[in-house]
Amino acid sequence: MPTEEAGAPDDHPEAASGEELPGQIERRLLGRPASMGRREVSEGAGVEPVVARRFWHAMGFQNIEDDDAMFTEADLEALKRVARLIGEGEVSEELALGMTRAFARTSDRLAVWQTQLVAESLTSPFSEELEGRDSRSVPEPRIAADAAELLASICDDIEPLLVYVWRRHLTNAIARMLADADPAVHADPSAPIRVVGFADLVSFTSFVRRMSERQLARLVQRFELLASDVITEHGGRVIKTVGDEVLFVHTDAAAASAIALDLVDAMAQDELLPPVRVGLAHGRVVSRLGDVFGLTVNKASRITAVTPSGHVYVDEDMAKVLGSVSGFSAIERRRRMLRGIGVVTLHELQRAPGGRGLALRDGSA
């Protein structure tokens, strides 16, 4: 328990002036106060100052003078870890810099997002309406101070969750990479054949720029619920939803086609959601830990990326299967070079006159 007297300046942001609060938060988040210059950190880690400067820039931080006391023990330990990885030959300096940039860009976006979420959670929706203010604007000083205090107080509990989520995603990414690179997987006759579909909200990034975090949360939740309802109604299986995209599979081409077209219709009729586009591919997939991998999955994703808003495009294999399925037609459109796939002839999926897909509930997706 803290030994300082309750109400001391370091305990509560309201006891500090606006100039003091950033320093307090920095000490709480980074540990010891910044006391070292770049040259001192470089020498402590056993690397040249130019190398330390490269990694500092890779993390996305501004340029500083050699003698500016901007660094803490945490900075020194981080640089030591990187230097050790490079020195032991585990990774090259180029790879280490690339991974640092990846961490930095993701972490910067995550930190900004979370500060906005916390500040918004402390802002009364009623007061926003009275003031006609978007909660994505700069919060008032009291809200900003309270948000800073809350983030600092829960940081130690959130940090393990961040590492856990990253390891989970890293596991999935490695599994997909290995599955995609294994020729035996694609030739394995025992691998199940599925229709894989990606549904993607069109112009999502520009759409959400006009929204508050609370509005964005409602939109994403609405999309996930509506997509899940449509997919499960036709006996499909939702693999995952990530923000503006949903991945689903089905064993039946007709049911998968009905899902795709119904998703387009459902989003078009919903006033909250932007239009959607869907890509379908038919082929063998690898299922691991509830996810699906392989060329068919990659193809469906690439097809979705080139599909016009409000339409459904399918690959050649799916078009061939639909040739013997009533209620749908696949109209050849054009050949496209898809990154990582090659040249693919795309077909637009449409309902045949008077036809609607039947809901198939075989539960085998």
Question: Where are the regions a protein language model picked out?
Answer:
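Alpha-helical scaffold within the catalytic cores of cyclic-nucleotide enzymes
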Residues: Q221-G235, L247-R284, L295, K299-T304, ...
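Catalytic NTP-binding/metal-coordinating core of nucleotidyl cyclase/transferase enzymes
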Residues: A184-D262
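Cytosolic regulatory/linker segments at or just downstream of nucleotide-handling modules
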Residues: G310-A365
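Short, surface-exposed loop/helix-turn segments at secondary-structure junctions
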Residues: R288-G294
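Conserved, well-folded catalytic cores of nucleic-acid-processing
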Residues: A58, Q62, L85, Y164, ...
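Arg/Lys-rich, alpha-helical DNA-contact motif
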Residues: M1-E43, V47-D182
